[in-house]
């Protein structure tokens, strides 16, 4: 399995393309000069395209991925209704979802042969909208509205329209600030990192009565931490055994173990990392974690070790200025 790491650096308007070797080393393949401040990225489900959100002209760019080395070739673009804070796709590669924090909206852009078209749906009134996360069954879009302490739930139709579910939302504790989400491989639980109180919520997607319920909230900060809480990103290993979340003030990655059924998290440790880690990601083997330091202008590669899933640094690499996003493609 070949793996490629992509990092987005908005301050220098660059995408760095790296080959991830089996021993965890990175080899630079390409540096792409992008037409704007590149931030969120996602790889298409068929692994053929990289979609990138850019500012200040709000667009989604599509780059075709070269199969042998992961290099990028510009393929197309489409306008977005708001500044893209987070982008994702449905599991079938038919739609791109864009969340806009500044405009407080989520949008749906159809894909035709991998290329984005004209936006078909925009839902507004989502203050601090920070991500759009499709459920494992490809039916429900979970959209955290950070400033409203709620996660809105929408049903995705076959033609890309969103309709409010019943219930239309779930709420966090006041001041939590729900931000990014991941789902357990068993499709029974979702995990949301809360930016403003640096906690992680465990959501049972459907209990026996059909309700969505928060079954655990866990503080992700060390007990002696007294600074401003500022959590950012969250990811889970492909086998569902280890979960990671980062905080930008403390510049740490918190390591969690996950119970076999996915319902319970436990803190296993804290890994110091690059300054102000805005984004990180995991490789597809579940062996490596790659973190970006927004203020260090470097990325670091960590090996995931042992039953606890603790992190051991393998190397660090200079990238563009202000790196904010990391994605990994297996091909």
From Swiss-Prot:
Query: Which Gene3D superfamilies does the annotation name?
Result: YVTN repeat-like/Quinoprotein amine dehydrogenase (2.130.10.10)
Q: What is its EC number?
A: 3.1.1.31
UniProt-listed InterPro entries: 6-phosphogluconolactonase_YbhE, Cycloisomerase_2, Lactonase_7-beta_prop, N2O_reductase_N, WD40/YVTN_repeat-like_dom_sf
Which Gene Ontology BP terms does the record give?
Answer: glucose metabolic process; pentose-phosphate shunt, oxidative branch
Molecular function as annotated in GO: 6-phosphogluconolactonase activity
Coiled-coil region(s) at which residues? none
Cite the annotated pathway.
Answer: Carbohydrate degradation; pentose phosphate pathway; D-ribulose 5-phosphate from D-glucose 6-phosphate (oxidative stage): step 2/3
Q: What class of enzyme is it?
A: hydrolase
Keyword set includes Hydrolase: yes
* Database matches in SUPFAM superfamilies: Nitrous oxide reductase, N-terminal domain
One Pfam family name from the record? Lactonase
Q: GO CC terms on record?
A: cytosol
Keyword field: Carbohydrate metabolism, Glucose metabolism, Hydrolase
Keyword Nucleotide-binding belongs to the record: no
* Reactions catalysed according to its record: 6-phospho-D-glucono-1,5-lactone + H2O = 6-phospho-D-gluconate + H(+)
Question: Which family does this protein fall into?
Answer: Belongs to the cycloisomerase 2 family.
Described purpose of this protein according to its UniProt entry:
Catalyzes the hydrolysis of 6-phosphogluconolactone to 6-phosphogluconate.
Protein name, UniProt field: 6-phosphogluconolactonase
Q: Which organism is it from?
A: Klebsiella pneumoniae (strain 342)
């Amino acid at each position: 399995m070949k793996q490629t790491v992509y990092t987005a650096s908005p301050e220098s308007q660059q995408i760095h393309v790296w080959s991830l070797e089996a021993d965890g080393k990175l080899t630079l393949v390409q540096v792409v000069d992008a037409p704007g401040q590149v931030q969120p990225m996602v790889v298409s489900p068929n692994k053929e395209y990289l979609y990138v959100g850019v500012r200040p002209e709000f667009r989604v760019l599509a780059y075709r991925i070269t199969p042998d080395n992961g290099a990028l070739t510009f393929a197309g673009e489409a306008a977005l209704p708001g500044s893209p804070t987070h982008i994702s796709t449905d599991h079938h590669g038919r739609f791109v979802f864009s969340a806009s924090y500044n405009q407080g909206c989520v949008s749906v852009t159809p894909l035709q042969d991998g290329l984005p078209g004209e936006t078909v749906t925009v839902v507004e009134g989502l203050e601090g909208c920070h991500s759009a996360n499709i459920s494992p069954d490809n039916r429900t879009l979970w959209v955290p509205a950070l400033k409203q302490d709620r996660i809105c739930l929408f049903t995705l139709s076959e033609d890309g329209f969103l309709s409010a579910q019943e219930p239309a939302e779930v709420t966090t504790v006041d001041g939590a600030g729900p931000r990014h989400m991941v789902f357990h491989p068993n499709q029974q639980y979702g995990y949301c990192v809360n930016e403003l109180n640096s906690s992680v919520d465990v959501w049972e997607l459907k209990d026996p009565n059909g309700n969505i319920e928060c079954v655990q909230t866990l503080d992700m900060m060390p007990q002696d931490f007294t600074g401003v809480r500022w959590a950012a990103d969250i990811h889970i290993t492909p086998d569902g055994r280890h979960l990671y979340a980062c905080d930008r003030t403390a510049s740490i990655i918190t390591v969690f173990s996950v119970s076999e059924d996915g319902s319970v998290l436990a803190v296993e440790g804290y890994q110091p990392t690059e300054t102000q880690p805005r984004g990180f990601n995991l490789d597809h083997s579940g062996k490596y974690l790659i973190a970006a330091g927004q203020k260090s202008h470097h990325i670091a590669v960590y090996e995931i070790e042992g039953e606890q899933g603790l992190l051991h640094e393998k190397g660090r690499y200079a990238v563009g200025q202000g790196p904010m996003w990391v994605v990994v493609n297996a091909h």
